[in-house]
Each structure stands twice: as C-alpha cells, then as structure tokens.
C-alpha cells in the first residue's frame, strides 16, 4: 500500500464521490486527511480512499486551482 502523504493521488472508495480521483492536500492525523481535485475539498477518513502509486508535487494546503493544474499536467483529470 502506498503511503498517506501530501501529493499522493488516491481514489475515493466510499461515499457519493466514490470512484473519483483526488489528491491528499493535508494530513490531519492518523485517521483523517484533506482531499481535493476531482472531488469537493473536504476532510476524509483514510479508510475511505485507496492510495495509488502516483504522486504530484504539491505544497501542504495547496489551493484547489493548484491541485487541478497538477492533476491536469500529470494527465489524471
């Protein structure tokens, strides 16, 4: 399993956004992260995402525009 870290590309597995691609923007603690990208920016349980082996370069707390530009440049949007 890939590490839970800022910039890691994930796929939401549960909830109304299940199946959508997202990026970890911030790690809050061992159970919660903040995701953004092809989903609404929100806090998410780490059990509700599946990390992939892909990673984009982002700063902690990057804006939604920066996240979308990084995903588009990586060809993931």
Curated annotation (Swiss-Prot):
Renumbered to this chain, the signal peptide range is: none
Give UniProt keywords alphabetically.
Answer: Ribonucleoprotein, Ribosomal protein
A Gene Ontology cellular-component term: cytosolic large ribosomal subunit
Give the record's GO biological process terms. Answer: ribosomal large subunit biogenesis; translation
- Select a single GO molecular function from the record's annotations and give it: RNA binding
Out of the domains of life, which is the source? Archaea
Q: Which Gene3D superfamilies match?
A: 2.30.30.30
Family matches, as PANTHER family: 60S RIBOSOMAL PROTEIN L14 (PTHR11127), LARGE RIBOSOMAL SUBUNIT PROTEIN EL14 (PTHR11127:SF2)
Tell me its family: Belongs to the eukaryotic ribosomal protein eL14 family.
Checking HAMAP family in the record gives: Ribosomal_eL14
Q: Which named protein is this?
A: Large ribosomal subunit protein eL14
User: Origin organism of this chain?
Assistant: Methanococcus vannielii (strain ATCC 35089 / DSM 1224 / JCM 13029 / OCM 148 / SB)
């Amino acid at each position: 399993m890939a590490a839970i870290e800022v910039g890691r590309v994930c796929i939401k597995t549960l909830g109304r956004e299940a199946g959508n691609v997202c990026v970890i923007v911030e790690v809050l603690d061992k159970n919660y992260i903040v995701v953004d990208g092809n989903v609404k920016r929100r806090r998410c349980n780490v059990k509700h995402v599946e990390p992939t082996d892909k990673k984009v370069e982002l700063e902690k707390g990057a804006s939604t525009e920066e996240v979308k530009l990084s995903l588009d440049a990586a060809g993931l949007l």
